[in-house]
C-alpha cells in the first residue's frame, strides 16, 4: 500500500495512535505542549525507537516488533524549526550533500541541487554561505536539501519559527508548491492555524499521546470537536489554499 502508515504508542500511558497519510497528502498534527507531537516526528524519522509500534512507507516495513530501520536508511526528509546547514559549504554544496551521500555522481548531484533550488525559488543563492542567509532564505535552502534526497515521506516541524512574520506567507507558498511537485506523504507539526489552512489537507489533534480528532482541514476548522481544536480555530481564519 502506498503512503505512510503508523500505529503505535507515543508514551508510557500506552495509548494507541494511528496515522495514515496517502501520497501527495499533507497531514497537520496540532496539540498542546506535551501532547507528543515532537515525539511522533522523532519516532517516524528514526530518532526514537517505540516501545510498541509499526511504521511502513510505500509497503516497506521500517519498524515493527522484529525490525528497526535506522534513520539514515529511511529516506525521510526532515525540515526542522532551525535550518541546520553546513557552514563550510556554499548553498549548492549543502543541497548536493545528500545526493552525493547516496552515491550520485558529483555533476549529477550539483545539477539536481540546482533543480531543487530553482523549485523553491532560491537558485540565486547557490554561491552564498549559510551565514549570509536570512531566516527565510535558510528555510528555503533547507527545504531544497531535504527534497534533493528524493524522500519517500516529508516531516516538517514548525518550519517558520525562525522566519520573519512578513516573509512567512511567501515561504508557505513555496513549501506548498514544492510538496505538490514531489507528491510524497507529508506530516507537519505546527501551532499556527495559518500553517494548517495554507499547507494541510487533513488535521490530527493530538492530546496526551493519542489522536482525539482527525479529518479534512475545512471540516475540522468549521466544526472542531476536541477542546484544543475549538481553542485553536475559534477565531477568523485565512481561507484554505485551493
List each language-model region with its residue ranges.
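Helix-to-loop junction immediately C-terminal to a conserved catalytic motif
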Residues: 45
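Conserved ABC ATPase "signature" region
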Residues: 64, 107-125, 176-177
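A short, proline-enriched helix->beta-strand linker immediately N-terminal to the Walker B motif
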Residues: 148-152
Amino acid at each position: 500500500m502506498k503512503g505512510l502508515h503508523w500505529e503505535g504508542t507515543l508514551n508510557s500511558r500506552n495509548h494507541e495512535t494511528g496515522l495514515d497519510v496517502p501520497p501527495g497528502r499533507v497531514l497537520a498534527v496540532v496539540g498542546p505542549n506535551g501532547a507528543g507531537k515532537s515525539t511522533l516526528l522523532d519516532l517516524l524519522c528514526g530518532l526514537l525507537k517505540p516501545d510498541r509500534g509499526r511504521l511502513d512507507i510505500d509497503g516497506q516495513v521500517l519498524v515493527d516488533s522484529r525490525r528497526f530501520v535506522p534513520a539514515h536508511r529511511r529516506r525521510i526528509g526532515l525540515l526542522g524549526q532551525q535550518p541546520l546547514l553546513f557552514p563550510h559549504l556554499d548553498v549548492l554544496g549543502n543541497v548536493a550533500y545528500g545526493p552525493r551521500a547516496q552515491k550520485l555522481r558529483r555533476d549529477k548531484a550539483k545539477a539536481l541541487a540546482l533543480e531543487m533550488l530553482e523549485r523553491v525559488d532560491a537558485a540565486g543563492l547557490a554561491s552564498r554561505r549559510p551565514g549570509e542567509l536570512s531566516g527565510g532564505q535558510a528555510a528555503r535552502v533547507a527545504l531544497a536539501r531535504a527534497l534533493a534526497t528524493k524522500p519517500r515521506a516529508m516531516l516538517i516541524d514548525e518550519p517558520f519559527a525562525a522566519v520573519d512574520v512578513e516573509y512567512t506567507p511567501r515561504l508557505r507558498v513555496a513549501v506548498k508548491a514544492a510538496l505538490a511537485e514531489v507528491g510524497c506523504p507529508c506530516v507537519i507539526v505546527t501551532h499556527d492555524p495559518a500553517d494548517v489552512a495554507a499547507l494541510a489537507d487533513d488535521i490530527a489533534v493530538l492530546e496526551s499521546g493519542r489522536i482525539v480528532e482527525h479529518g479534512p482541514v475545512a471540516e475540522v476548522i468549521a466544526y472542531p470537536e476536541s477542546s484544543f481544536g475549538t481553542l485553536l480555530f475559534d477565531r477568523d481564519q485565512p481561507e484554505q489554499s485551493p
